[in-house]
C-alpha cells in the first residue's frame, strides 16, 4: 500500500480540462488524461464556478475537483509504462485496438488472446482498468 500525506486534494481547473479528467470510456473527452489522472485518485466534481465569481472576470468557466488517493492502487513497476501504453493507443484513437496491441506485443501474440479483448473496439471504448491490465502485461515483457 502506498502511503499518502493527505486525505484529499482540491484543485480548480478550466471546465473543459476538468471534463476531460472526469470523462469515462466511450465519451468524446475520454483519453490519456482521463486514464492517467484516475490511476492514483478517485476524482469527483465539487462544483462548476461561473466566471462572474471572479474579478477580473475570465472568459472561461471553472470547475472545482476533489482528488482522493485510492486505497487499492493498481501497482506498476514504472508509471512511465502506463504513459507509454496510453500514448500508443491514443496516438490514433479512431483506429481499432488491434494495431496498438500488435505494436506492444509483437513478439507475444498469445498475450493478445490472453487479454480477451474485442479487437474491433477503439481505444476510447476500453475501461481505465483494461488499460491498467494491458500495462501490467506489457511490464511483464520489458
Question: Which ranges hold each PLM region?
Answer:
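Short, Lys/Arg-enriched alpha-helical microdomains
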Residues: 131
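Intrinsically disordered, Lys/Arg-rich low-complexity segments
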Residues: 134
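Class I S-adenosyl-L-methionine
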Residues: 1-123, 128, 139-142
Amino acid at each position: 500500500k502506498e502511503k499518502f500525506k493527505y486525505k484529499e486534494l482540491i484543485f480548480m481547473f478550466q471546465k473543459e480540462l476538468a471534463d476531460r479528467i472526469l470523462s469515462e470510456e466511450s465519451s468524446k473527452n475520454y483519453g490519456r488524461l482521463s486514464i492517467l489522472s484516475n490511476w492514483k485518485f478517485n476524482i469527483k466534481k465539487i462544483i462548476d464556478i461561473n466566471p462572474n465569481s471572479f474579478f477580473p472576470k475570465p472568459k472561461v468557466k471553472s470547475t472545482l475537483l476533489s482528488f482522493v488517493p485510492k486505497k487499492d492502487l493498481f501497482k506498476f513497476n514504472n508509471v512511465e509504462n502506463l504513459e507509454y501504453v496510453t500514448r500508443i493507443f491514443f496516438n490514433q484513437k479512431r483506429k481499432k485496438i488491434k494495431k496498438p496491441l500488435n505494436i506492444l506485443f509483437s513478439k507475444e501474440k498469445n498475450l493478445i488472446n490472453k487479454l480477451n479483448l474485442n479487437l474491433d473496439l477503439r481505444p476510447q471504448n476500453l475501461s481505465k482498468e483494461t488499460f491498467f491490465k494491458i500495462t501490467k502485461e506489457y511490464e511483464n515483457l520489458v
